[in-house]
UniProtKB/Swiss-Prot annotation:
Residues 1-20 form the signal peptide. Gene3D superfamilies: Porin. It holds the Pfam family Porin_4. The keyword Transmembrane applies. SUPFAM superfamilies: Porins. GO terms for biological process: monoatomic ion transport. Keywords: Cell outer membrane, Disulfide bond, Ion transport, Membrane, Porin, Signal, Transmembrane, Transmembrane beta strand, Transport. It comes from Pasteurella multocida (strain Pm70). It comes from the Bacteria. Changing A167T: In strain: Serotype 10. It is found in: Cell outer membrane. This is Major outer membrane protein. GO terms for molecular function: porin activity.
Amino acid sequence: MKKTIVALAVAAVAATSANAATVYNQDGTKVDVNGSVRLLLKKEKDKRGDLMDNGSRVSFKASHDLGEGLSALAYAELRFSKDVKNKDGEVIKQPIGNNVHAKRLYAGFAYEGVGTLTFGNQLTIGDDVGVSDYTYFLGGINNLLSSGEKAINFKSAEFNGLTFGGAYVFSDDFDKNGLRDGRGFVVAGLYNRKIGDVGFAFEAGYSQKYVKQEVASVLPPPPGSVTVYKDEKEKAFMVGAELSYAGLALGVDYAQSKVTNVDGKKRALEVGLNYDINDKAKVYTDFIWAKEGPKGATTRDRSIILGAGYKLHKQVETFVEGGWGREKDANGVTTKDNVVGVGLRVHF
């Protein structure tokens, strides 16, 4: 589950970990390094069991105090593995440590009591929306513009539990006459309050982006013809609310999206329940209902996820998680799927 954490200049370097090691702190300049190795042993229906990298990373965070509450910041995050895909875009291999690459790379400014403004390859505020996903790797229905390789992102400081912001993402194609695939914006608001042992959260976001759509042809295309694409807008919104008491939390999210000139919408509802048994152990469950397509030709999905997590140490986390899904297409044909995984995360 993603929590809204906003705290002056330090929070501006997103994903700050309490376990970060400060390697330099002098004359207003601070540099932190942290990371984690995340491994997952997974078995999916009709596939072989496999051991894979589940997002291992190393991050570097730097901030420079400019005075008067203003600071400059920079963030770089390295990942170590990339899926191998075939020509149709299907994943055929998931190696471990086959590709060291920069997953995030951005810089910007933070102003105390106002917020942060960053530029580069980063998550947007849209990624913060969602309260019902308590899982480690199977849950989540976020449909917003949540990241961009060329993004400008603003996130406010917290004002009595309220945080808000927006982001603009540039298209990868700088050709003026080219497709604008990926270009768009997102705005979001996050509200979190806690009174005693009772907590409440409400989050909402809206985004628009251009997506590439194939131009339909009345006649079958001749052999050797080139597929033609055009830009269409995808409009999406997501809302969620969470109620918590002591170690028990219940979250509900709803997401919907629609592409211009494409029949039908995508809708999804996720309900999550999490119970922290103590500081080390938790159990959780998630239910997801989704449907896609025009009336009379709708595909429906149902999923249930169960899991438990246990911390062997404040920096060593283990978990087991299983999911069972059922999809029913427009013709009434039902397909079932299941997956189970055991994971280990060692933070440093």
